[in-house]
């Protein structure tokens, strides 16, 4: 087997309420994914708060480095949500802004990075990251499953049609799900995709086009573009999720969670867990308990 000589990195979008979870993710990457770089994009107002995580292979960056100068974040919430305003777009929800940051990372990270793996703050890596499990015969993994249960699937497909002017046949999109932790984006593919999106915008800006798209999914957009436009250039398809999804509210104690994690990690396909919080209320298991549950893997 040839040695891997490409440069890859992990990318995380985070903010202040997820600081402790992101800190635990960093700890797990230190143990299992060194020496790969890890870029952490945070809201501008949280940049100073996250400086403790700017060490070693971890690089904290402001999300505004990706956003165009003409986007303005409202300092207060409307209808319970933060919005970004610009003279060229509809009001943009913060979760759409985070997607824009994922798509635009290659504009601001180091030029030697060929591919990135997007990983959520709420993930914990519990097994060594072996790139050979995600890179085969010169191609990176592209997660795709036919077990499509995404509630917003129809919206995601309509967004793709809008971005690419119906260039992809409907039946090639309807049955597939591209969402998983981790999702890999290749620089060459991403730059090609954003260039194509820009073509249909009056200002030749993929960011304006994307911001004016209703309910997009960055993973659906990238996956469908690579599969149907680029014909799997730089990618191969795999339907195994690297991180097992667990609902935080299903666990009350660290012991209960530890038993589940131990069972999950008996499966060789998983390299970690994704413990997602729901409404971030008192019923959710704390990061401290999650860390205690993972102690035997991380020590």
Regions found by a protein language model. Give the residues of each.
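N-proximal low-complexity "stem/linker" segments adjacent to membrane-targeting elements
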Residues: 1-27
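Short, charged/polar "capping" segments at the starts of alpha-helices
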Residues: 20, 45-51
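Short, acidic, metal-binding catalytic loop of nucleotide-sugar glycosyltransferases
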Residues: 27-36
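Short beta-strand/loop segment that forms part of the nucleotide-sugar
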Residues: 35-46, 61-67
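Active-site-proximal specificity loops/subdomain of glycosyltransferases
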Residues: 53-107
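GT-A fold catalytic core of metal-dependent nucleotide-sugar glycosyltransferases
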Residues: 101-142
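Conserved catalytic core of nucleotide-sugar-dependent glycosyltransferases
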Residues: 129-209
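A glycosyltransferase accessory/donor-loop signature
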Residues: 200-299
């Amino acid at each position: 087997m040839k040695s891997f000589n490409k440069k890859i990195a992990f990318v995380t979008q985070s903010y202040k309420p997820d600081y402790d979870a992101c800190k635990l993710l960093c700890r797990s990457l230190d143990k299992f994914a060194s020496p790969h770089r890890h870029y952490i994009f945070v809201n501008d107002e949280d940049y100073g708060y996250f400086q403790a995580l700017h060490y070693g292979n971890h690089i904290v960056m402001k999300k505004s480095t990706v956003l165009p100068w003409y986007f303005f974040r409202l300092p207060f919430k409307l209808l319970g949500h933060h919005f970004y305003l610009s003279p060229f777009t509809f009001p943009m929800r913060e979760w759409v802004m985070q997607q824009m940051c994922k798509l635009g990372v290659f504009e601001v990270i180091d030029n030697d990075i060929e591919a990135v793996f997007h990983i959520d703050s709420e993930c914990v890596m519990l097994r060594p990251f072996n790139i050979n499990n995600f890179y085969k015969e010169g191609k990176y993994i592209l997660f795709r499953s036919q077990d499509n249960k995404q509630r917003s699937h129809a919206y995601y497909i309509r967004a793709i049609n809008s971005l690419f002017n119906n260039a992809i046949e409907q039946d090639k999109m309807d049955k597939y799900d591209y969402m998983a932790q981790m999702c890999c984006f290749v620089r060459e593919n991403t730059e090609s995709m954003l260039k194509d999106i820009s073509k249909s915008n009056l200002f030749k800006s993929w960011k304006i086009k994307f911001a004016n798209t209703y309910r997009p999914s960055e993973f659906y957009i990238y996956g469908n573009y690579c599969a149907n436009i680029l014909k799997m250039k730089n990618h191969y398809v795999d339907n195994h999720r690297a991180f097992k999804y667990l609902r935080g509210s299903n666990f009350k104690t660290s012991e209960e969670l530890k038993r589940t994690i131990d069972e999950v990690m008996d499966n060789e396909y998983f390299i970690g867990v994704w413990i997602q919080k729901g409404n971030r209320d008192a019923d959710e298991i704390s990061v401290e308990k999650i860390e205690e549950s993972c102690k035997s893997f991380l020590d």
